[in-house]
Amino acid sequence: MNLIDLILIAIYVIGISGLIFNKNNIINILIISELNLGTLGMLFVLASVELNDILGELSGLYILTFTAAESAIGLAIVVILYSKTGIINIRHLNKLKG
């Protein structure tokens, strides 16, 4: 394990702790999930380079497309929630019933 792997693992652990401590704000949750999935994709690519295997790079590309779709859906939910309630709080998601 080299220094870059350790830094990426530390960033992932910081992201998980951010998810544990920031449960109310949707924007924070989206940013933290983007950070975690981006870090996970980079770890897959680094492992793929170290093992000389293409599967990790393809997994990194799949994770990148998944995070793009996740952020688009998450931001759409945030816009709808803010237009209905005026508050961006995860506790108000039950007001989106329609």
UniProtKB/Swiss-Prot annotation:
- Spell out where the chain crosses the membrane: 1-21, 26-46, 61-81
**Reaction catalysed by this enzyme:** a ubiquinone + NADH + 5 H(+)(in) = a ubiquinol + NAD(+) + 4 H(+)(out)
> What cellular component GO annotations does this protein have?
mitochondrial membrane; respiratory chain complex I
Q: Which InterPro entries match?
A: NADH_UbQ_OxRdtase_chain4L/K, NUOK/Mnh_C1-like
Print the keywords alphabetically.
Answer: Electron transport, Membrane, Mitochondrion, NAD, Respiratory chain, Translocase, Transmembrane, Transmembrane helix, Transport, Ubiquinone
Q: EC number(s) for this protein?
A: 7.1.1.2
The answer on whether this UniProt entry bears the keyword Transport reads yes
Bilayer topology term:
Multi-pass membrane protein
Q: Give the subcellular location.
A: Mitochondrion membrane
Q: Which family does it belong to?
A: Belongs to the complex I subunit 4L family.
Its biological purpose is as follows: Core subunit of the mitochondrial membrane respiratory chain NADH dehydrogenase (Complex I) that is believed to belong to the minimal assembly required for catalysis. Complex I functions in the transfer of electrons from NADH to the respiratory chain. The immediate electron acceptor for the enzyme is believed to be ubiquinone.
- From the Swiss-Prot or TrEMBL record, give the protein name: NADH-ubiquinone oxidoreductase chain 4L
What is the organism field in this record? Dictyostelium discoideum (Social amoeba)
User: What taxonomic ancestry is recorded?
Assistant: Eukaryota, Amoebozoa, Evosea, Eumycetozoa, Dictyostelia
